[in-house]
Design a protein with these regions (language model features):
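Glycine-rich cofactor phosphate-binding loops and adjacent beta1-alpha1 units
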Residues: 189, 197, 201-271, 330-333
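Glycine-rich beta-strand-centered segment in the early N-terminal region that forms part
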Residues: 19-35, 48-95, 129, 134-137
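C-terminal hydrophobic helical "lid"/dimerization subdomain
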Residues: 183, 236, 280-334
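Residue-level marker of beta-strand positions
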Residues: 61, 80-81, 96, 122, ...
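Short N-terminal strand-loop motif that marks the start
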Residues: 1-63, 125, 153, 328-334
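Mid-domain Rossmann-like dinucleotide-binding core that forms the NAD(H)/NADP(H) cofactor-binding site
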Residues: 82, 135-215
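NAD(P)H dinucleotide-binding glycine-rich loop of Rossmann-like/cofactor-binding domains
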Residues: 90-168, 195
């Protein structure tokens, strides 16, 4: 099979021909149709996340069809359309796993980081961490739901019942969260890179009541701000935009250092919280919710061979919505 592989950090991905992997007893073999490109992939390629498996097939927003199941698999059968997210496996026995917080499991293994992911024609995944995809989405349209959607969903739940919601960094996750927030009756206030009129117009099309530069304040104090951009300097700015009792939710897996800020902008029972990974419950809830909203993903589809171009465009902030790699032709070899 064709695959795009990371062989060293800070280097472009390399095209390789790899054997089709074989599923273990609790795994499924999936013919990959589409894999969305996530900022986490970029952090791995750019060496900002330590010690990935090398060589590595990146990608953790995978949609495809089950080809083969391991002998212990009971929840999936060949032919089912499934999605595979970032959380690849957990121990199931630690305090976190036993209390519904498997996203914090110290033994967790992640797709496209510790385990080979979806930048390939086929992949194997734990059946317990693979989810049937419903709704009228094409495979490419469904792919961003598997991380941009899931992490966005978890961030929105952390924001509680916030009515006035700010979103900083209006990309793949934000454009999904905005739709869900509007469905829930919230006001969306979108913050973009200064001067990014295209992103601000995109946010308004998705129902934002206000869209402006990240270094400006919204017309009214907000109940919550979700930060998707990996920029630590946005944290103090988000605090300044909050009403007393509000919360800043940091949704990225990596962020530059947060600069010092005066206690006065935190005072008033304002809070800062990070979101780490996701749980299977998050996946089940969101994948059931998305068709009801309905969430519509804005995608740019590229062939798998252009994975480096997709990463470059993401790094440069040139994408609205999400880039998705078409992996169907990559099954032909191997």
């Amino acid at each position: 099979m064709h695959a795009m592989c990371l062989e060293a950090a800070h280097r472009p991905l390399v095209a390789r021909e790899l054997p089709v992997p074989e599923p273990e007893a609790d795994e499924v073999l999936i013919a990959v149709s589409a894999c969305a490109v996530c900022r986490t992939d970029l952090h791995i390629v750019d060496g900002e996340l330590a010690e990935p498996k090398l060589p590595l097939v990146p990608g953790h927003e995978i949609v495809g069809h089950v080809v083969e199941v391991g002998r212990e698999v009971e929840n999936l059968v060949p032919g089912m359309r499934v999605g595979v997210p970032w959380l690849g496996s957990t121990c199931g026995a630690c305090t976190y796993c036993r209390s519904g917080r498997e996203n914090l499991c110290p033994s967790a293994r992640f797709t496209g980081y510790h385990r080979d992911g979806g930048y390939a024609g086929y992949t194997v995944a734990k059946a317990a961490y693979s989810f049937e995809i419903h709704g009228d989405y094409s495979d490419a349209e469904a792919a961003p739901l598997l991380c941009a959607g899931l992490i966005g969903h978890r961030c929105l739940r952390q924001a509680g019942d916030a009515r006035r919601l700010g979103i900083m960094g209006f990309g793949a996750a934000a454009h999904i969260v905005a739709q869900v927030a509007r469905f829930e009756g919230r006001e969306v206030h979108a913050f973009t890179r200064p001067g990014d009129a295209t992103a601000q117009a995109f946010a308004r099309r998705l129902g934002a009541v206000w869209a402006g530069d990240a270094d400006t304040l919204p017309p009214q104090p907000l109940d919550a701000v979700i930060i998707f951009a990996p920029v630590g300097a946005l944290v103090p700015q988000a605090l300044r935009a909050l009403a007393p009792g509000g919360i800043v939710v940091c949704g990225g897996i990596h962020m530059s250092d947060i600069p010092s800020f005066p206690y006065s902008i935190l005072w008033g029972e304002r809070r800062i919280v990070s979101v780490a990974n996701l749980t299977r419950r998050d996946a089940e809830e969101f994948l059931a919710l998305a068709p009801r909203v309905p969430v519509r993903t804005d995608i740019t589809v590229l062939p798998l061979a252009e994975a480096n171009l997709a990463l470059d465009r993401l790094r440069a902030g040139e994408l609205s919505g999400a880039a998705v790699l078409d992996c169907r032709a990559s099954r032909d070899a191997g």
